[in-house]
Amino acid sequence: MLFFIDETWQTIAGQRVGALGAVAIPQDQYNGFCASMYAIKKKELGASELMHAEIKGQSCFAKSAFKRQALHGDSALLKAADRLLGALTSHQARVFVIWTTHPDLLTLRHAGTTKVAKPYKELLFDFRALMENEAPGHLGSLNFDLRGTRADETTAAAIQNYMVRTRGGWEQHFLCVPNFTVSSVSPGLQAADVIAYLGARLAPGQDRPELQPYIERMRGLTYEFTRPGRSARRIRTARRVS
């Protein structure tokens, strides 16, 4: 199972929101997903190579894209986003969103390598639930955007340390060393960017009603599982932490 993770920070109704967005795609589906993404980029955005015309949530869902759709009847960026969500469905993907408005969690990470911040920890728990329930005996691979920042390196080291130092059977379900890839050459990371953008819009006060159909489609791709314990609570992998 391939997991692709991205981050976003947005101001919604005057409130700062931080969100992690992730996509899980079965490894045997990923080449097909990449082929679908190339077809989308070629038809809708005029790309001649897979790495051209990077798809990003902020661009696809910009107000200007909706204005163009209203004035001219279509928008290439909105079509690309629509078809991307369709490709996630057809290639058996699941999506994950952890969002927060809590001042202490807004950075989404810790400054050091010895502790994983709560948003990332909750995301990892959800990943593990998917692996335990849907892919037992297989290993998941965590993939991040290679931006070359020290903060990214620190987060990767913190996740690796957490997996190897704590109980939880992480090594049974994951390769404990995260991968970093430039997002322009990774359809999975571009999908995670779109999911992160929409995921932040789950925050109260969402002031862009035109986004609601896309948000609902994103919700439909989330994973739902029962958390072990007395309460046996049902958990859906698009939620707030505080």
Each predicted region: which residue ranges?
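Phosphate-ester processing/binding pockets and catalytic centers
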Residues: M1-S242
